[in-house]
Amino acid sequence: MTSKLPVELRSALDQARLLRARKISARELLDLCWARVEKHNPRLNAVIVSDIGRARKAAAVADKRLKAGEPRGIFDGVPMSIKESFDWTGTPTTWGDPRFAGNIAKSDAVALTRLTDQGADIFGKTNVPLMLADWQSFNAIYGTTNNPWDVTRAPGGSSGGSAVALA
């Protein structure tokens, strides 16, 4: 059954299938996802660190591989965000704790490497509560992540930013 959802709202596996079938390019898919971030993030504060330039370069490389019929892995060209607590080279990893505000990742976390080894295109990091341990997603570095369905309510803690980014 074909999904009636816009491509940027479909599952990562559906997006990967569309990319491999060349129904959409990695750059087009990234731009659709990024447009949603730009539209909704000012109100929601889910994506708190981003590197769209790096993501666009990765999308261009993925498009070349996909065009050649040589995908890197199952997620080649699929745009994704990761939780702020995972190291992503050159970006802050603070766990929402002001004591770690100057901590810049020198390498990628193992979990992130496993995603990128499969071709995932990381564009940003999502908000977390202090030390990932609260029922909501607030910290003194990045502020509060708001529930997309009712901004007066919390989206949950630990992975609240990730949940809102998906919603």
Range-by-range predicted roles:
Residues R43, V61, R65, Y142-T144, ...:
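Short alpha-helix boundary/capping motifs
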Residues S25, R43, R72, D121-I122:
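A general structural signal for well-ordered secondary-structure junctions
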Residues A62-P79:
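Immediate post-signal peptide segment of exported/extracytoplasmic ligand-binding proteins
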Residues M1-K57, K67:
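An N-terminal boundary/leader segment
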Residues Q15-L19, A62, S162:
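Generic hydrophobic alpha-helical segments
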